Amino acid sequence: MLTFWLAVATLSALALVAGAVLGFAARRFQVKTDPVAERIDALLPQSQCAQCGYPGCRPYAEAVAGGAPINKCVPGGEAVMLKIAAQLSVDPQPMDGEASSRPESRVAWIDEGNCIGCTKCIQACPVDAIVGATRAVHTVVSDLCTGCDLCVAPCPTNCIEMRPLAITPTSWKWDLRTIPITVIQQEQHV
């Protein structure tokens, strides 16, 4: 019985020392982050698509906090740019040429007859929208795909292409400014 309590005491002391060392290390080597970059990063869509010219959303947020243009986020579009402008109290900028000229709703499509199951597209996809296994046919989950094109280049058989998103009631972009509205005045009944 003495051996049992000795083992418990030894493990408890070891856990206490390890906890103290880890607590000290966490405070001593703490990485300080920019709170402005944190707020901007929270506004970005987190697709990590690199269409802005930065390797991901966090580096772009840090660059914007440092003064980079706020109009480079293609997946977020004008809505994200306006939120960033409001957050930083700066004037909104027109969308970048590449961001505005690109079709808004595109998804990757895999020709399953030519897919060899190499998994290079799965490794390139930043949002895990491609499913499949090694030497098996892959397919794209269109609800998750952001249309970033990063899966197209690594494909050795060129079986991936970007196609327009099929228009459904949930994906339709309603432009309420083009709907004619007629104001009907009701007659007063006494």
From Swiss-Prot:
Cofactor: [4Fe-4S] cluster
A single GO BP: electron transport chain
Annotated 4Fe-4S domain residues: 32-90
Database matches in Pfam families: Fer4_21 (PF14697), FeS (PF04060)
Region (Hydrophobic): 1-26
GO annotations of cellular component type: plasma membrane
Annotated EC: 7.-.-.-
Keywords of this entry: 4Fe-4S, Cell inner membrane, Cell membrane, Electron transport, Iron, Iron-sulfur, Membrane, Metal-binding, Repeat, Translocase, Transport
Binding of [4Fe-4S] cluster 3, residues: 125, 145, 148, 151
Residues bound to [4Fe-4S] cluster 1: 49, 52, 57, 73
GO molecular function, one term: electron transfer activity
InterPro entries xref list: 4Fe-4S_dom (IPR007202), 4Fe4S_Fe-S-bd (IPR017896), 4Fe4S_Fe_S_CS (IPR017900), Elect_transpt_cplx_RnfB/RsxB (IPR010207), RnfB/RsxB_Proteobac (IPR016463), RnfB_subfamily (IPR050294)
UniProt remark on cofactor binding: Binds 3 [4Fe-4S] clusters.
Residue stretches making up the 4Fe-4S ferredoxin-type domain: 106-135, 136-165
Location of the protein in the cell: Cell inner membrane
Alphabetized SUPFAM superfamilies for the sequence: 4Fe-4S ferredoxins (SSF54862)
Residues annotated for [4Fe-4S] cluster 2 binding in this entry: 115, 118, 121, 155
Task performed by this protein: Part of a membrane-bound complex that couples electron transfer with translocation of ions across the membrane.
Subunit architecture: The complex is composed of six subunits: RnfA, RnfB, RnfC, RnfD, RnfE and RnfG.
HAMAP family in alphabetical order: RsxB_RnfB
Similarity comment text for this entry: Belongs to the 4Fe4S bacterial-type ferredoxin family. RnfB subfamily.
Designated name of the protein: Ion-translocating oxidoreductase complex subunit B
Organism: Sodalis glossinidius (strain morsitans)
